[in-house]
Amino acid sequence: MHQMTLAEIAKGLEAKQFSAEELSRALLARIAQLDPQLNSFITVTEDLAIEQAKAADARRAAGENGALLGAPIAHKDLFCTNGVLTSCGSKILTGFKAPYDATVVEKLKAAGTVTLGKLNMDEFAMGSANESSHYGAVKNPWDTSRVPGGSSGGSAAAVAARLLPAATGTDTGGSIRQPAALTNLTGIKPTYGRVSRWGMIAYASSLDQGGPLARDAFDCALLLGAMAGFDAKDSTSVDQPVDDYLAALAQPLAGLRIGLPKEYFGAGLDARIGEKVMAVVEELKKLGATVKDISLPNMQHAIPAYYVIAPAEASSNLSRFDGVRFGYRCENPVNLEDLYKRSRGEGFGAEVKRRIMVGTYALSAGYYDAYYIKAQQIRRLIKNDFVAAFKDVDVILGPTTPNLAWKLGEKNADPVSAYLEDIYTITANLAGIPGLSMPAGFVDGLPVGVQLLGNYFQEGRLLNVAHQYQQVSDWHKQAPTGF
């Protein structure tokens, strides 16, 4: 059963080949057996899962028949889950059990999904390797000496290892797409405002967006359809109807205009990844797409701009974690200042502290104009590049990552080298457009991802292109040995 996609699970449950409870018990046993090799879960919610699975079976017995009714998933551990530890991968949230469900959790629960647990992640979603978690590094099931990507590394590793069919993630600078690429999954970051951020603990409020990771575009469409939509509780949510993503999948690609940005294929890209990307382009041409070269000239400024804006927002967002109201508190503080300093000093990890300091510096009176305002101006130029490009093309295609999954610990001494791994993904967050990564083959046994970028609220088109490619390829069906 663990090899089944969400679509196959829905058919099996409908045909009464197995119950949601049987499926959940089988996957919980698999998690107990295999996750010690990966460390993808922070919390396994066994009792909750069985309770939800029984409820899903009862709903089905009463005649209900939703596509996600009884589907087992797990949530990245920054979505608040009522009564369950929500840690953000940080010591500072030790023991914090949210008193409510995030909107994403609520919507998926209403659709009948079964929550198997909370997934490991880079601390407060800051990282590209899932090595900064207080709960330990996550390992890539394709090679357990390598990183799975980040920050949604637990989500990616668990789905890739067939511990569960799909999971939620979040993407601030590539945190769904990059791990999807490094673990052979399909993952989509929706348009900013498409999925509610209420109850999703913030890293950088103007960049964060939740989305699904799954094995194929069909399953992503299923999940995104349930996750997306306006939420009055989230002031950044956009009140626009949600497309029928499943209906969009079948659209033929004849006449689709694909743009290849020259900036995505220059220095820094592993040539073997470039070859895999061009092989995907050739397949899409056979399916009727046309291809043209384009330019996104301001992409070169994306990483510096992102690493001013995101830490600036993080330094503000993370100021609420002070040892007073919830989570970790230092022992025997001598006064209030000592409580703040030591609780935060002991509670946050090195990467989070680094970004808080960078962000506080960028927002300080003497440097605000030189850094923060300048970064926001660059952000507007990047957005303008995309607006211009989408006048001539429907989808922009390129590699998701410049390199294959690297060895655990390899980039720890040089954080900038890890930041550069997000070079192709960050621009979508700065501009707020949707982006998807899909499997495109293997180099030396390690997965390669291709990224598709679309215009605002064109998630359906990205899922359509990925689905059509997955009808003529089987990369997405390959599973790691030993899992």
Curated annotation (Swiss-Prot):
Belongs to the amidase family. GatA subfamily. Keywords: ATP-binding, Ligase, Nucleotide-binding, Protein biosynthesis. One of its GO terms (molecular function) is glutaminyl-tRNA synthase (glutamine-hydrolyzing) activity. Its EC number is 6.3.5.7. PROSITE patterns: AMIDASES. This is Glutamyl-tRNA(Gln) amidotransferase subunit A. Heterotrimer of A, B and C subunits. The keyword Cell inner membrane does not apply. GO terms for biological process: translation. The lineage of its organism: Bacteria, Pseudomonadati, Pseudomonadota, Gammaproteobacteria, Pseudomonadales. InterPro entries: Amidase, Amidase_CS, Amidase_dom, AS_sf, GatA. The active site is at 76 (charge relay system), 151 (charge relay system), 175 (acyl-ester intermediate). Allows the formation of correctly charged Gln-tRNA(Gln) through the transamidation of misacylated Glu-tRNA(Gln) in organisms which lack glutaminyl-tRNA synthetase. The reaction takes place in the presence of glutamine and ATP through an activated gamma-phospho-Glu-tRNA(Gln). It catalyses: L-glutamyl-tRNA(Gln) + L-glutamine + ATP + H2O = L-glutaminyl-tRNA(Gln) + L-glutamate + ADP + phosphate + H(+). HAMAP family: GatA. It comes from the Bacteria. The keyword Membrane does not apply. SUPFAM superfamilies: Amidase signature (AS) enzymes (SSF75304). One of its GO terms (cellular component) is glutamyl-tRNA(Gln) amidotransferase complex.
